[in-house]
Amino acid sequence: MIQAQTYLNVADNSGARELMCIRIVGASNPRYAHIGDVIVAVIKEAVPNMPLERSEVIRAVIVRTCKELKRDNGIIIRYDDNAAVVIDPEGNPKGTRVFGSIAGELRHLNFTKIVSLAPEVF
Amino acid sequence: MPVPLCMKSIVASPESLGARPLSLLNDMRRPDFRHSVTGRLGPIRSITTINGPEATVTDGSATSPDITMPPRIKFKRPDKTAKHIMQILDKEAVEEVRKEREIPDIRPGYIIQMKVVVPENKRRVSVLKAIVIARRNAGLNSTFRVRRLVAGVGVEAVYPLYSPNIMEIKVLDKKKVRRAKLYYLRDKINPLKK
């Protein structure tokens, strides 16, 4: 359940370290974002000498939440932190590597590139 | 019309409720069994009041409107209640699953290795080595919670114990814990398994 002002870790090597969510993308003005939702975020902390800099507004897709993700087969998944992957307006990740396990739901939401880069899809 | 003898055995106090089927069996050996069964099927269900036998027998022919009946307190036979029936169904379903697959005893503190079919991945996730941190018993819907470290991030997952997606569960190690729910492991960086 990510909302505005939520800090998120970054799960790729795009150059950002920490993001703060400022807006959830969606026509119905959603209050919370879950795994697979796109958010608009500002970079609060960045790795030096990379294309992305601090206080830059970018879009990201949420890949890990502390709030449980429920599946139809009864399996419930819960991560220990909130994390996102920085993407461009088309939905392609800006980085070249993705860290951590990625939920399989992202594949159905057309984030296939992120899923293919993931070390483990669960 | 004399009350047939079998009627007296049916008009019972609530203590002999459980023995009622037996009394019916006894009646079957009697010569006038046919008469008794065709005569009265009503009171068998309604003899559940606590007030006393004389209040319950309603002879269809003989009640006069002057007799005031005390209020009936109905309660169901325990083996007819929905709760009991659901318990039986649940046990049957659990036994059916246990016949197909061998599901070991899983308790918190066990380190298990499971093979799960993940439909999203279209393949088996083979080595899921995790520590069981909780177990919830609810018949067929029993679930257990496992925790593992994936690429530096802790992941907890709740699985239904009798889920067909779980191919195999193997207990690797049993750690001594003094809790039923090991949620304190979330704060510890180094889970027990190391």
From Swiss-Prot, chain A:
Gene Ontology MF term list: large ribosomal subunit rRNA binding; structural constituent of ribosome
Pfam family, one: Ribosomal_L14
GO cellular component, one term: chloroplast
The UniProt record lists the keyword Chloroplast: yes
GO biological process, one term: translation
Domain of life from the UniProt record: Eukaryota
Subcellular location, record wording: Plastid, Chloroplast
Annotated TM spans: none
Keyword check for Lyase: no
InterPro entries assigned to the protein according to its UniProt record, in alphabetical order: Ribosomal_uL14, Ribosomal_uL14_bac-type, Ribosomal_uL14_CS, Ribosomal_uL14_sf
Keywords assigned: Chloroplast, Plastid, Ribonucleoprotein, Ribosomal protein, RNA-binding, rRNA-binding
SUPFAM superfamilies: Ribosomal protein L14
HAMAP family cross-referenced by the UniProt entry: Ribosomal_uL14 (MF_01367)
NCBIfam families per UniProt: rplN_bact (TIGR01067)
Protein family per UniProt: Belongs to the universal ribosomal protein uL14 family.
Subunit structure: Part of the 50S ribosomal subunit.
General function of this protein: Binds to 23S rRNA.
UniProt protein name: Large ribosomal subunit protein uL14c
Protein species of origin: Amborella trichopoda
Gene giving rise to this polypeptide: rpl14
